[in-house]
């Protein structure tokens, strides 16, 4: 199931149009992803209280939070394959040995009724289905087009509270077959892996859920993997090693992000520790 923990590097989109869901998986992180896998606790069936029970039987129980309520989904480890003998939908890892993305995708499809039912969606809503007390929010980036300073501040605050984020590029009549001149797939969901500042410039690290597949495209502007901006100091500061191979992961300035994306998808975890705050404006 998990060969080496859960990482965004394990996820590569297949023939299913669920880039939003896979982008959500990409930002969950190892701990949250592993926590989605449950074993059934039933005192009347001793074998089923064994955490390895579902591994032994080839079945898995997963916990979601649809509509604010826990929902448990049980699936087996059979996944659809295409006529080339490869997973038809999500592929896990370069060697295909990471099973967790395909199992989670299958469980999510069962949660909503079918694989077809989970085609096309929003990153923040998928995150809310997988995070305890998740509060989803969608922001239209045109709101910040004339106020980059406000966007920089908003993004910094979201990163500070460890909000989970994704992004959506503008729709296109060709769907995600269209790629703009800067290498951004159109009508496509991306994961926001990190937000950081370097020498006074705010940067975002994003991931195309196509991963290392043949359909992958990457940003080719400032801070792209082949950019001269990647000095030894920059690599160390941002903890990033540019990859000669297109793997879907890249950094870009927030100014270019505003010009190339249409929405930012946010899911914040509301906890008692964080507290509640109320603001009102008198009319």
Predicted regions and their residues:
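Accessory/interaction modules and long regulatory regions
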Residues: 1-283
């Amino acid at each position: 199931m998990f060969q080496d923990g859960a990482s965004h590097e394990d996820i590569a989109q297949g023939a299913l149009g669920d880039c939003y869901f896979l982008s959500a998986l990409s930002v969950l992180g190892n701990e949250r992803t592993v926590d989605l896998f449950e074993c059934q606790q039933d005192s009347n069936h001793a074998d089923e209280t064994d955490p390895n029970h579902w591994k032994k039987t080839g079945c898995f129980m997963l916990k979601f939070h649809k509509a604010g309520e826990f929902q448990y989904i049980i699936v087996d480890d059979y996944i659809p394959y295409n006529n080339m003998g490869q997973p038809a939908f999500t592929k896990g890892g370069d060697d295909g040995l990471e099973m967790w993305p395909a199992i989670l995708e299958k469980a999510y499809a069962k949660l909503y009724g079918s694989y077809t039912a989970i085609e096309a969606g929003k990153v923040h809503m998928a995150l809310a289905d997988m995070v305890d007390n998740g509060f989803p929010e969608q922001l239209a980036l045109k709101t910040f087009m004339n106020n980059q300073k406000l966007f920089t501040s908003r993004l910094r605050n979201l990163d500070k509270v460890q909000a989970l984020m994704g992004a959506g590029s503008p729709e296109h009549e060709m769907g995600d077959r269209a790629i703009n001149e800067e290498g951004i797939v159109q009508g496509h969901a991306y994961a926001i892996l990190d937000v950081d500042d370097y020498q006074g410039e705010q940067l975002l690290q994003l991931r195309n859920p196509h991963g290392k597949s043949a359909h992958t495209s990457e940003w080719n502007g400032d801070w792209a993997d082949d950019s001269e901006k990647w000095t030894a100091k920059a690599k160390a500061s941002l903890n990033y090693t540019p990859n000669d191979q297109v793997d879907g992961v890249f950094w870009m300035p927030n100014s270019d992000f505003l010009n190339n994306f249409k929405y930012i998808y946010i899911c914040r975890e509301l906890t008692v520790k964080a507290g509640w705050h109320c603001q009102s404006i008198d009319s």
